[in-house]
A protein has these predicted regions:
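Glycine/serine-rich phosphate-binding loop and adjoining beta1-alpha1 elements at the start
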Residues: 2, 8, 79-170, 298-300
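An N-terminal-biased, well-structured beta-alpha scaffold segment characteristic
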Residues: 5-106, 110
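Glycine-rich phosphate/diphosphate-binding loop of Rossmann-like nucleotide-binding domains
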Residues: 6-45, 152-240, 287
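Short glycine-/small-residue-rich Rossmann-like dinucleotide-binding loops
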Residues: 69, 75-76, 95-96, 221, ...
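Residue-level detector of alpha-helix initiation sites
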Residues: 76, 136, 177-178
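Adenosine-phosphate binding glycine-rich loop
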Residues: 118-159, 269, 274-372
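Rossmann-like adenosine-cofactor binding region
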Residues: 209-291
Length: 372
C-alpha cells in the first residue's frame, strides 16, 4: 500500500502523522511511504531521517494526495486538503465532525473513506487514539490556565499554588475522564484546591481512591456546576461524549457571575465546547475576554508541545496503520470492530450515528457499507 504523510497546515500545528521510526516499521512490511518535504522539520525530524527510514520525499502536498492510497494525518483536513481527497482513498486522522458540518459535507463529497482517531475504541470501551492527546491537553490545561490567571494576561493575578499565609487558588474540572484526571493531577501537583465534577458515581469513586483528600468530587447537577463555577478561579472543561457534540454545561449566565479575571479553559472545543461562551481560538491568538472572564479555547492544544504529542500519538496509531496497510481498510475494519468504530464517513455517507444525529445528516451503519 502507498501511504501518504502530508505536512499539517492548520495554524501553529507542528505534529506529523508518522515519525521516521514508524515509517521504518511500515516500509519493513513492504509498503511505500510518501512524505511531503519538511513535514516534521519543526519538531526535529528532517527529510534525511525519513529517507533513511525508507520513505520517498515529495515536493508538494498535491503529489502526496495524488499518489497515496492511505493518508495519515493528525488534525482534521483543511478545505484545500479536502479538495485533494478522492474516491477510494482512505483518510486516517482526528476529525471531530459533530461540531463541523462544513467539513463533514466536504468529506462526503470527496467520496473518501474517513476513519477518525477519536472514535476508535478498545475492549474496555476506552478511546485509545484519543487518550494520548487527552493526557497532553489535560496536563497543558492547568499550565495555560495558570498563565492566563497572571495579571498581564488579563487574569485576576492569582497564583494557583498560593504561598504561606495566602490561600491557594481553586480549580474546577468538569469531567473525570482521561483529560480531566490529568488536569486534576497537575492542579494537585502545584498545590491548588481541586474539585472534579462528573456524572458517573463509579468514576468519582475511582478519583477519590486515586487522589484521596487532595481532590473534592461532586456529582454532576446543574446546581453543583453553577455553585462550583462561580466559586472557581480556573474552570477546565474536559467533558466528552464520544463522537458527539459536547454538552453546554456552563451557561452564559454562570460565566457572567464569575469573578472578573477568572479563567475558562475549554478542552472540549474540538467537539463544540462545553461553555456557552466558547468559540475556537488558535495558538497565535489563544484567548479572549467575555463577561470579564478569560477564555482559552485553542482547538489543537497538544500542537504547542508537538514533539511530545507526535511521539505519544504515534505509539498509539501505529498498530492501526499497520492493520490498514497490511489487510486493506475494508478487511481491517471487518476483523477489528474497535477500529471499525472509527469509520465516520464512507463514499458520501455518514457512518457514525452521533455525527449524523448532531448534524442532521443521513446515516448508514458501518456494518452495511462493509457488507457484514
Amino acid at each position: 500500500m502507498r501511504i501518504g504523510v502530508p505536512k499539517e497546515i492548520k495554524t501553529h500545528e507542528y505534529r506529523v502523522g508518522l515519525t521516521p521510526a514508524a515509517v521504518r516499521e511500515v516500509t519493513a512490511n513492504g509498503h511505500q511511504v510518501i512524505v511531503v518535504q519538511g513535514a516534521a522539520a519543526a519538531i526535529g525530524f528532517n527529510d534525511d531521517a525519513y529517507r533513511a527510514a525508507g520513505a520517498t520525499i515529495a515536493a508538494t502536498a498535491d503529489e502526496v494526495f495524488a499518489n497515496a492510497d492511505l493518508i495519515v494525518k493528525v488534525k482534521e483536513p483543511q478545505p484545500e486538503e479536502i479538495a485533494r481527497l478522492h474516491q477510494g482513498q482512505v483518510l486516517f486522522t482526528y476529525l471531530h465532525l459533530a461540531a463541523d458540518k462544513e467539513q463533514t459535507e466536504g468529506l462526503m463529497r470527496s467520496g473518501a473513506t474517513c476513519i477518525a482517531y477519536e472514535t476508535v475504541t478498545d475492549p474496555r470501551g476506552a478511546l485509545p487514539l484519543l487518550a494520548p492527546m487527552s493526557e497532553v491537553a489535560g496536563r497543558m490545561s492547568v499550565q495555560v490556565g495558570a498563565h492566563c490567571l497572571e495579571k498581564e494576561q488579563g487574569g485576576a493575578g492569582v497564583l494557583l499554588g498560593g504561598v504561606p499565609g495566602v490561600a491557594a487558588g481553586k480549580v474546577l474540572v468538569l469531567g473525570g475522564g482521561v483529560s480531566g484526571t490529568n488536569a486534576a493531577r497537575m492542579a494537585i501537583g502545584i498545590g491548588a484546591r481541586v474539585t472534579v465534577i462528573d456524572r458517573s458515581l463509579p468514576r468519582l469513586q475511582e478519583l477519590d481512591q486515586q487522589f484521596g483528600a487532595r481532590v473534592h468530587t461532586l456529582f454532576s447537577t446543574t446546581a453543583a456546576i453553577e455553585q462550583a463555577v462561580i466559586d472557581a478561579d480556573l474552570v477546565i472543561g474536559a467533558v466528552l461524549v464520544p463522537g458527539a457534540a459536547a454538552p453546554k454545561l456552563v451557561t452564559h449566565d454562570m460565566v457572567r457571575r464569575m469573578r472578573a479575571g477568572s479563567v475558562l479553559v475549554d478542552i472540549a472545543i474540538d467537539q463544540g465546547g462545553c461553555f456557552e461562551t466558547s468559540h475556537p481560538t488558535t495558538h497565535a491568538q489563544p484567548t479572549y475576554v467575555e463577561e470579564g472572564v478569560v477564555h482559552y479555547c485553542v482547538t489543537n492544544m497538544p500542537g504547542a508541545v508537538a514533539r511530545t504529542s507526535t511521539l505519544a500519538l504515534g505509539n498509539a496509531t501505529l498498530p492501526f496503520v499497520m492493520a490498514l496497510a497490511n489487510k486493506g481498510w475494508r478487511q481491517a475494519l471487518i476483523d477489528d470492530p474497535y477500529l471499525c468504530a472509527g469509520l465516520n464517513v464512507h463514499a458520501g455517507v455518514v457512518t457514525y450515528h452521533a455525527v449524523a444525529q448532531d448534524l442532521g445528516l443521513p446515516y448508514r451503519p458501518a456494518a452495511s457499507v462493509l457488507g457484514v
